[in-house]
């Protein structure tokens, strides 16, 4: 028996009905946590390449218990690095377990996607893990030497009428945070009110302008606790919403392990005069990112952090410009410029800490059928004390 997937859409939502046959209702569901790992349990995943570029896709999945997983997929699905599971959006998924199958009914708001106005075709694929038959099934055939989520092998999804605009033009999320405390030992009290907010503006159908003022990240999901017994830093995923969308445009340069020039998690953290990492508040930030056309992507980011004189931390501006041009069927060439610079000349600043800049070019190779893929890059760092050999 084959898995059945049927779709409908209106001006607001994409509706998906799925029936997954099975030998019995003895499904393996090891976790009810959102964004669960697909391997080793029963589940089905849908991939939508809304710009038909074979490089980026939206990813939605569920298991027989109705647990949801969604992600942004970049880099053409050539490796696991392209998954961004920190991205979340609102959508509905209900499931029912039968004796010989499970059924899923899904409604995804069209505002969750980005696409060109008037679009009539997306690229689509789905894959399913079946533990009872120990199988991995896909709608479009994918060679066994490729990842099951490869965007090189996708079918066409045709809409009966052209789609409208992909996003609401403006989204504003304000916040206010109050704090009150008493120090009975010193007979004093502390009262504090903090306010700020985030705003997202749609520019056309494929560009976003994100703005943040005095951001409050208290609602961000807590990081997984890891005991680090090595002398090396742990690289934890970015979970702050301001930095997530199109994050691959800024952070997918160099080598993810030892040659990545920009890691957004460092913004908002600084070392005090004792060399300890502490929180460094963000005053404001702006971020423009998306597609200028089907072949050219642009990202501009600027974030200002506050000064902390007591801990000898300067006010710093963090700026990034990234440009990505598509080449051939699925390859691209990217340009990156990073500038981190103290906004004033502080007495406690050493010469090497006044600024640091990086300029770089990356070429990401991905053939049409993903037989050939690779990465070539050269990056150069500039600071007051850097010599000519600081190249990666």
Residue ranges and their predicted role:
Residues 1-326, 331-335:
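Structural preference for beta-rich elements and adjacent junctions enriched in aromatics
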Residues 123, 205, 319-340, 351-378:
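Transmembrane beta-barrel wall of Gram-negative outer-membrane proteins
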């Amino acid at each position: 028996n084959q898995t059945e997937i049927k779709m409908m859409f209106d001006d607001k939502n994409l509706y998906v009905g799925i029936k997954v046959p099975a030998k019995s209702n003895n499904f393996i569901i090891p976790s009810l946590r959102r964004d669960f790992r697909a391997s080793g349990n029963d589940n089905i995943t849908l991939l939508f390449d809304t710009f038909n570029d074979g490089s980026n896709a939206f990813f939605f999945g569920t298991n027989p218990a109705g647990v949801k997983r969604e992600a942004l997929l970049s880099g053409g699905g050539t490796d696991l690095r392209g998954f961004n599971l920190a991205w979340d959006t609102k959508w509905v998924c209900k499931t029912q377990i039968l004796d010989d199958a499970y059924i899923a009914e899904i409604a995804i708001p069209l505002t969750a996607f980005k696409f060109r106005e008037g679009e009539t075709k997306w690229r689509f694929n789905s894959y399913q893990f079946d533990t009872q038959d120990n199988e991995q099934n896909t709608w479009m055939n994918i060679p066994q030497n490729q990842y099951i989520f490869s965007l090189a092998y996708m079918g066409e999804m045709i809409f009966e009428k052209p789609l409208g605009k992909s996003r609401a033009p403006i989204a504003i999320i304000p916040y206010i945070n109050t704090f009150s405390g008493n120090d009975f030992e010193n007979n004093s009290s502390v009262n504090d009110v903090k306010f700020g907010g985030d705003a997202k503006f749609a520019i056309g159908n494929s560009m976003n302008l994100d703005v943040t003022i005095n951001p409050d990240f208290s609602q961000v999901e807590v990081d997984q606790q890891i005991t680090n017994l090595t002398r090396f830093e742990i690289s934890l995923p970015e979970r702050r919403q301001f930095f997530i969308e199109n994050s691959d445009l800024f952070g997918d340069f160099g080598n993810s392990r030892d040659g990545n020039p920009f890691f957004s998690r460092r913004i908002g953290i600084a070392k005090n005069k004792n060399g300890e990492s502490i929180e460094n508040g963000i005053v404001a930030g702006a971020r423009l990112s998306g597609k200028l056309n089907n072949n050219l992507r642009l990202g501009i980011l600027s974030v200002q952090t506050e000064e902390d004189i007591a801990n000898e931390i300067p006010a710093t501006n963090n700026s990034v410009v990234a440009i990505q041009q598509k080449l051939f069927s699925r390859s691209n060439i990217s340009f990156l410029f990073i500038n981190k610079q103290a906004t004033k000349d502080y007495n406690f600043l050493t010469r090497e800490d006044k600024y640091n800049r990086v300029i770089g070019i990356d070429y990401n190779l991905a053939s049409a059928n993903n037989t050939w893929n690779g990465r070539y890059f050269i990056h150069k760092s500039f600071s007051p004390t850097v010599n000519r050999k600081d190249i990666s």
